[in-house]
Amino acid sequence: MTADELRRIAYQVPFKPFRVRLASGEQLEIARTLRTTVAEDRAIFGVDEDPQTRVARRMRMVPLREIVSVEVAA
């Protein structure tokens, strides 16, 4: 996945939740806008959302080369 491809998904208006599948088999659920920052070779995702505060509990820095696919919710 390229930085531009991920930016198009992460910053689309209106925002649509998406799932990032990593080479390790791990999946990251991105449910809200402004939870993703994309650089040229990596992305930072806000994950593990607190259901009461709706704040991400952790940040994950992922090299783009480790992203196998991204699925956008319908």
Where are these regions (language model features)?
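Motif-centric detector for short Cys/His coordination patterns
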Residues: 1-74
